[in-house]
């Protein structure tokens, strides 16, 4: 709340409110960068984030909201985005996307160790996820947890889980596993998964041109790298052919791998390089590209858009390696012939 000495002056009250939001953003960014580059993921901290998100509606419940102007509302949205990025980073999706090593125990797996060694924190997380229907911001979290818990089920099918952990994952009604329920929840139309992901990838946090909120280029690229892991999670869990509409997913890929006008392209080109040198080797990560390539030329635009995005190049920042990789992929397109109607044959 505002001090009484400030509340009576609209100008100073607005400055105070803006400063308070900037402090929240600064603290969250410090926490994100610590977990991104320094600290190991913590299940207890993840549970704290989810509980904080529920209490504050992911930062949207602010005591001084009545004084917000357009800039303050934009900062408030960034607080929501930062909380989501912080929670997703604590889930270590990049490790969860890797192939499960044969015979490994859950506590020894880099992707599972935080949750496997702290069943109480995992249970706290699941309790919060049960409240997901109240806020579409939970959709990316449901998707992320589905990936990690699927991996935990895979490990548990070969190596017995610790009894307390197994009890946490036990399904009382003998229905689908928890990870399947979370995945179904994420894709429920009411959760607006693709709209929420679009909002995340277009957040000012990911822009380097405007230096939004004073964030550095490295911070913006770190958020984009975390989002890339979230993006690959979609096709890791659901084959693109089963999605009712591929266009929203193609949109997300283009926004992730293509720099916005004025943004620094070098770091984003590095994401394209990572895709062509590492991700392309995994069928699930390359499945969207393979799907649009098979559908070409009957469905023309998706492949063209992905080729443009994954080329990793810009007029002022060429990237020959990624362009070459993209051209090699296009060289294996089954056909570039289009079937013309009879009325156009003599044109």
Which residues are covered by each model-predicted region?
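Extended alpha-helical scaffold regions
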Residues: 1-344
């Amino acid at each position: 709340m505002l001090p009484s000495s400030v509340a009576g002056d609209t100008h100073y009250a607005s400055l105070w409110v803006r400063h308070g939001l900037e402090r929240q953003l600064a603290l969250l960014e410090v926490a994100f960068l610590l977990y991104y580059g320094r600290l190991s993921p913590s299940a207890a901290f993840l549970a704290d984030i989810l509980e904080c998100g529920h209490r504050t509606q992911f930062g949207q419940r602010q005591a001084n909201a009545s004084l917000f102007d357009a800039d303050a509302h934009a900062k408030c949205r960034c607080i929501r985005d930062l909380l989501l990025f912080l929670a997703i980073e604590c889930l270590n999706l990049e490790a969860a996307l890797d192939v499960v090593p044969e015979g490994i125990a859950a506590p020894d797996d880099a992707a599972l160790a935080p949750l496997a060694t702290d069943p109480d924190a995992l249970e706290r997380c699941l309790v919060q996820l049960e409240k997901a229907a109240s806020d579409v911001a939970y959709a990316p979290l449901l998707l992320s947890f589905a990936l990690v818990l699927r991996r935990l089920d895979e490990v548990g099918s070969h190596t017995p889980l610790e009894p307390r952990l197994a009890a946490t994952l036990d399904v009382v009604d003998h229905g689908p596993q928890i990870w399947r329920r979370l995945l179904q929840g994420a894709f429920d139309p009411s959760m607006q998964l693709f709209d929420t992901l679009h909002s995340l990838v277009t957040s000012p946090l990911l822009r380097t041109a405007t230096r939004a909120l004073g964030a550095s280029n490295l911070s913006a690229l770190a958020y984009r790298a975390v989002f890339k892991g979230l993006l690959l999670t979609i096709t890791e869990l659901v084959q693109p052919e089963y999605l009712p509409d591929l266009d929203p997913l193609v949109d997300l890929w283009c926004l992730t791998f293509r720099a916005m006008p004025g943004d620094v392209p070098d770091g984003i080109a590095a994401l394209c390089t990572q895709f062509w040198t590492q991700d392309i080797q995994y069928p699930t990560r390359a499945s969207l590209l393979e799907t649009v390539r098979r559908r070409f030329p009957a469905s023309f635009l998706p492949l063209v858009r992905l080729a443009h995005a994954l080329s990793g190049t810009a007029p002022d920042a060429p990237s020959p390696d990624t362009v070459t990789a993209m051209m090699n992929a296009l060289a294996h397109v089954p056909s570039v012939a289009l079937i013309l109607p009879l009325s156009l044959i003599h044109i």
